[in-house]
């Protein structure tokens, strides 16, 4: 939970914007491969993505993508899963707001870890 303590407004806002830019640059790089290639076959595509630099770059981008999603989901949880907002929906949810928010954080944390593990396994298989 140290991550939640370190997440301050301007810092996470900037990190999410910079991560979006890096993801965009990666997508432009991959799309430029398609544009520059005269003929794309499975072998050309696999040679491109199985090269060490593309595996490394793709791994880094997926870690950045996961971090980007984590910031977005954390923001949703802290903004909308509070006693005030849940109490607006139903008064009985007020006493469960902290539990609901923590379960939400746990769920997307576990899903993110599983996602990252599977992606890295697939990339480096």
Predicted regions and their residues:
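Membrane-embedded alpha-helical bundles that constitute the cytochrome b-like, heme-associated redox core
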Residues: 2-125
């Amino acid at each position: 939970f140290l991550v939640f303590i370190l997440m301050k407004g301007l810092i996470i806002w900037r990190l999410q914007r910079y991560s979006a830019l890096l993801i965009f640059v990666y997508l432009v790089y991959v799309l430029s491969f398609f544009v520059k290639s005269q003929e794309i076959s499975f072998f050309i595509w696999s040679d491109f993505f199985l090269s060490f630099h593309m595996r490394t770059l793709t791994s880094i981008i997926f870690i950045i993508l996961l971090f980007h999603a984590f910031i977005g989901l954390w923001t949703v949880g802290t903004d909308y899963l509070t006693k005030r907002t849940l109490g607006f929906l139903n008064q009985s949810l007020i006493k469960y707001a902290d539990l609901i928010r923590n379960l939400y954080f746990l769920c997307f944390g576990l899903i993110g870890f599983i996602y990252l593990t599977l992606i890295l396994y697939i990339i480096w298989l």
